[in-house]
Curated annotation (Swiss-Prot):
SMART domains assigned to the protein according to its UniProt record, in alphabetical order: Ribosomal_L2, Ribosomal_L2_C
Domain of life: Bacteria
GO terms under biological process: cytoplasmic translation
Protein source organism: Ectopseudomonas mendocina (strain ymp) (Pseudomonas mendocina)
Name of this chain's protein: Large ribosomal subunit protein uL2
Gene: rplB
């Protein structure tokens, strides 16, 4: 994998920094694991915008990724190829199991075509294998972590993400997340060893606004540039600073204000994120 800075042959190329991976599959994705993906433009069933800055972009197919891997315990799989996925920052790996079935998984870092992977509590400790947290050694790096047994991976799924298993006590293990948060998770939940691939994703630069539009991201307008009817920071004669602490268009504090309200799982958090 290489970081390539483009020559400034035009204004749109001047600031482009690309991540080039020669090992990625260059052909079409595996068709039986594709699904139609329709665009909402950020609107709900009433036609009202519920998520801003969404619209347009290139057509995409959704890749069906296996986040559970619990029905293939003990069945070895061979990595056929590692692919680009437009729906996520991580790469995905196409596995061919010994029973002939193919499935996509989130590609772990260092896993290449030809590698052998297996899921199950008797699986060896190597990147890409999926086990219950109770069977993973303390100090190991993991990703694709379940919060409820059998529900599928929910934590550490994006490019370069991982968590460290730092303690095991009774029915729970303690994980240190990349955010600095330490939380308890049931030891019977599954996780995949290693960290997620494409850790260089954060080093890329799209270089121009149009590249964002290709990805379906619309512009973000500053509140101080709006009218008073549109935003609490709007209005004023000439350029103004907003006149109050930064808030969202609906008046909620932004820029670092705590928004977590889920008291039901507070006892699972040993230490808050930084």
């Amino acid at each position: 994998m290489a970081i390539v800075k483009c020559k400034p042959t035009s204004a749109g190329r001047r600031f482009v920094v690309k991540v080039v991976n020669q090992e990625l599959h260059k052909g079409a994705p595996y068709a039986p694991l594709l699904e139609k993906k329709s665009k909402s433009g950020g609107r709900n069933n009433n036609g009202r915008i519920t998520t801003r800055h969404i619209g347009g972009g290139h057509k995409q197919h959704y890749r069906l990724v296996d986040f559970r891997r619990n029905d293939k315990d003990g069945i070895p799989a061979t990595v056929e190829r590692v692919e680009y996925d437009p729906n996520r920052t991580a790469h995905i790996a196409l596995l061919k199991y010994a029973d002939g079935e193919r499935r996509y998984i989130i590609a772990p870092k260092g896993v290449v075509a030809g590698d052998q992977l297996v899921a199950g509590n008797m699986a060896p400790i190597k990147p890409g294998n999926s086990l219950q947290l109770r069977n993973i050694p303390v100090g190991s790096t993991v990703h694709g972590i379940e919060l409820k047994p059998g529900k599928g991976a929910q934590i550490a799924r994006s490019a370069g993400a991982s968590a460290q298993l730092i303690a095991r006590e009774g029915a729970y293990v303690t994980l240190r997340l990349r955010s600095g948060e330490m939380r308890k998770v049931l030891a019977e939940c599954r996780a995949t060893l290693g960290e997620v691939s494409n850790s260089e994703h954060s080093l890329r630069s799209l270089g121009k606004a149009g590249a964002k539009r290709w990805r379906g991201v619309r512009p973000t307008v500053r509140g101080v540039a709006m009218n008073p009817v549109d935003h609490p920071h709007g209005g004023g004669e000439g350029r103004t600073s907003g006149g109050r602490h930064p808030v969202s268009p609906w008046g909620f504090p932004t820029k670092g204000a705590k928004t977590r309200a889920n008291k039901r799982t507070d006892n699972m958090i040993v230490r808050r994120r930084k």
